[in-house]
A protein has these predicted regions:
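Zn2+-dependent peptidoglycan hydrolase active-site motif and core
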Residues: 23-26, 40-78, 99, 103-109
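Acidic, glycine-rich catalytic/binding loops that coordinate metals and/or anionic ligands
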Residues: 31, 80-89, 109-130
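Short acidic/polar mixed-charge low-complexity motifs
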Residues: 36, 65-68, 117-119
Length: 130
């Protein structure tokens, strides 16, 4: 799990309505307490850590299983690109950054391959939430 404590899904993976329009949600939104530590659910290498307009502060971790884990809307980042991380290591803290954010939560996504250009996978299944 990418953070400790109670996990509640506020927006599941897949098609949804967003601001009156149909939108494909490429991850799962998990509500939490502002500034809660976000941790890596698997060992891997940080391939991206920075800021993007929609997702705000974000991190991508490439795992030995050939999947990229995507963490979005974080308040602060604790790792940099090129660092190796271990399961349970702090990546940053939960926040509400970016233009596609409606309150403190973590958007968590899973992609096949390195980076976000591969097939998007169901993050809820990855986290055993369904």
């Amino acid at each position: 799990m990418p953070f400790r404590g109670r996990v509640r899904v506020t927006s599941p993976f897949g098609w949804r309505m967003l601001n009156g329009a149909k939108d494909f949600h490429n991850g799962v939104d998990l509500v939490g307490v502002y500034s809660t530590d976000i941790v890596s659910p698997l060992d891997g290498t940080v391939i991206m850590a920075g800021y993007g307009t929609e997702c705000g502060n974000q991190i991508q971790v490439y795992t030995r299983f050939g999947r990229t884990l995507f963490f979005c809307h974080m308040k602060t980042l604790s790792v940099r690109a090129g660092e190796t991380v271990i399961q349970g290591q702090k990546l940053g803290v939960m926040g509400a950054t970016g233009t596609k954010c409606f309150g403190a939560h973590l958007h968590f996504g899973v992609y096949e391959g390195k980076g976000r250009s591969g097939k998007v996978l169901d993050a809820e299944k990855f986290l055993n939430l369904k």
